[in-house]
Amino acid sequence: IKSSAASDVYKRQTWDRVEYVEGQNEYIPIRTEMKAFIDSYFKQANELAAQGDTTILSLVHSIFGENPYELKEIINRWMLGKNDQLKELLKKTGKDIQLPLIPTDSIVMKVDKEAVRRSGMKIPEALGDSIPEYMTITLRDANGNPKRALYKSELMMLEMLANANWERPIYMAITVGSENHLGMGNHFMQEGLAYRFTPFDTDKLDSKIDSEKMYDNLMNKFKFGGIDKPGIYIDENVMRMCYTHRRIFTQLVGQLIKEGQKDKALAALDYAEKMIPSYNIPYDWANGAFQMAESYYQLGQNEKANKIIDELANKSLEYMIWYLSLNDNQLAIAGENFVYNASLLDAEVRLMEKYKSEELAKHYSTQLDQLYNEYVTRMKGK
């Protein structure tokens, strides 16, 4: 993997890209979705694609360029064309075709079944060898409502899908917000730090993770860069990435347990503990530690599970004690945070009880009751 950025901002706008080099593939350009709103990105994406196949982005720059009426231009070129019926509809409902509507909220794409088979993507077990004839993309926002406009990045995504024809994989980083998924999250299959676009409805088919590829990526291909070295300082940005990596390990482990691959699940858990150690990256609900503990319990590794859940419970307990050290007025303001940590500790105690860690459960349940009763007593009348 190598990355490059233009240094002369006076000659051209800053350009970021990653080029993936493997075997005979030469350079395969990877598009930056967050930059897809920038006009120059489309032009540079084709100019600077090295030796990669650029036909995946065939839209001419004039459609996207500096023209302030890009959307109108796109509609005139793409949607109006020879479609007289649509043209009349827009004339009746719009003013000078300013587009108060999108004529459809669904796009249907014919699926090349042989290309899908050649692609190497996981075909959900529920389908057997049956691949759907068509892929339906419903244009909806993050709240499930029909979209009223398509932006440049979304048009780019749609065209990439249309032109790639499953001959090459198309991915989206797992850190991209759902508001930028163009309603296609039900076609994603996770292979690591990225979702792969598929022609399948992975939600309905219960096939959201390709455990084989994800296991290989996490266990054999990921490079962690020394975050396991004791005593190093990890800043906020790196810590967030560490949280993400621990979470995806728990997702993989959960899928492996579901598939009955317990040996691989245990190996993945132990590897995560080794490469993302708690002495540098403390256990936290936000980084999947609770799920790690539960997975260890499910695999019969109670000692390892107790270590994690004990640290989580102690953290929740310390927060509750600290909030109770405030005066009554301050505690009233912070009451929601106190209750939140109490709910975490309650969940942790219930997990201990579920897997028969009775001594540990009793230790924390007693303190939970005492602290919560103190909180209720102090907040009466507040």
What are these regions (language model features)?
Residues 5-382:
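ER/secretory pathway lumenal C-terminal domains and tails of membrane proteins involved
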